[in-house]
UniProtKB/Swiss-Prot annotation:
Single annotated GO MF: transcription coregulator activity
The organism of origin for this protein: Mus musculus
Keyword annotations: Acetylation, Activator, Nucleus, Transcription, Transcription regulation
Modified residues (N-acetylalanine): 2
Domain of life: Eukaryota
Gene Ontology BP annotations: positive regulation of transcription elongation by RNA polymerase II; positive regulation of transcription initiation by RNA polymerase II; protein ubiquitination; RNA polymerase II preinitiation complex assembly
Function (record text): Component of the Mediator complex, a coactivator involved in the regulated transcription of nearly all RNA polymerase II-dependent genes. Mediator functions as a bridge to convey information from gene-specific regulatory proteins to the basal RNA polymerase II transcription machinery. Mediator is recruited to promoters by direct interactions with regulatory proteins and serves as a scaffold for the assembly of a functional pre-initiation complex with RNA polymerase II and the general transcription factors.
GO CC terms in record: core mediator complex; mediator complex; nucleoplasm; nucleus; ubiquitin ligase complex
Protein name, as recorded: Mediator of RNA polymerase II transcription subunit 11
Amino acid sequence: MATYSLANERLRALEDIEREIGAILQNAGTAILELSKEKTNERLLDRQAAAFTTSVQHVEAELSAQIRYLTQVATGQPHEGSSYSSRKDCQMALKRVDYARLKISDVARTCEQMLEN
């Protein structure tokens, strides 16, 4: 269950980042709209620019944290909630067993042929 809560937490963080990107676009749009006017409201423009900058810094920090996490997971380092390594080891062991069976049957066939001659 810890795996699901960790995954849900990661997804929630990404959803928060997505909402923050929406806010960034909204702030940028408001600032551009204000700049297109003949007489700009400098206080509104300053507030929108400050909100834009703060949001961009927050998104950058959160995305960096997500990338660090994904890099750690992708490098094969063990971490809580990952069963990939165990599954891969099991798959490889099954393939080795199949290969051993194939070779043993080849040896048995060769022995039978030698006994017949």
